[in-house]
Amino acid sequence: MALPKIEDARKLSDEELAEEIAATKRKLFDLRFQQATRRLEKPHEFKHTKHRLGQLMTVEREREIAQTEIAVNSEQ
């Protein structure tokens, strides 16, 4: 499985992005639980899930910064 591209995350709406972040955090929690109980079959999924979470949170932060810049520019 190839790592997902950040362009895919940028295409999501704000609501979809928030849902995807929550789902990815839940998946990471489940993977940690599986690892603790020694049921983890694919340890590389940690890398993929953390990578995806980083991408999603980066896109979320980019949008926050863009909104802040718009607000600051509209005040001037």
UniProtKB/Swiss-Prot annotation:
InterPro entries: Ribosomal_protein_uL29, Ribosomal_uL29, Ribosomal_uL29_sf. It comes from the Bacteria. The keyword Ribosomal protein applies. GO terms for biological process: translation. Keywords: Ribonucleoprotein, Ribosomal protein. The keyword Nucleotide-binding does not apply. Belongs to the universal ribosomal protein uL29 family. This is Large ribosomal subunit protein uL29. It comes from Gloeothece citriformis (strain PCC 7424) (Cyanothece sp. (strain PCC 7424)). The lineage of its organism: Bacteria, Bacillati, Cyanobacteriota, Cyanophyceae, Oscillatoriophycideae. The gene is rpmC.
